[in-house]
Amino acid sequence: MFILAADLDRLKMINDTYGHSEGDNAIAVTANALNTSCINNEICARTGGDEFVVIGCGNYNENIVNGYIEAINGFFRRYNESSNKPYKVEASIGVYCGFIDECTTLKELVDIADKEMYDNKNKKRANRSD
């Protein structure tokens, strides 16, 4: 199984600079990126303002999940190249990929993916110049 946590990058800046309708657009684009990248009946859900989770049950491995992440990032890349928006829509992603046992709760696995997502978001912030 895998759990993917995604958090839209720079939503506050988009809302504050370009208005909430553009922020809503960025959220919708993120939802579309996740939904259109699903290939095996994964569950995609918005869990908060700019936070999403994707859960895939079954036989997933790191290569399959990495392909899924590449598809999401490819969706964002194509959107950003064609949208003519003054901002980029991107998301930070964290993943748990492995097995679940009777001692592990779904919340614990989501927390693992969430922590990785925030680690990735902080790395992006440190490398960004905006």
Model-assigned labels for residue ranges:
Residues 16, 55-60, 77, 98-99:
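Residue-level recognition of strand-loop junctions within catalytic nucleotide-signaling folds
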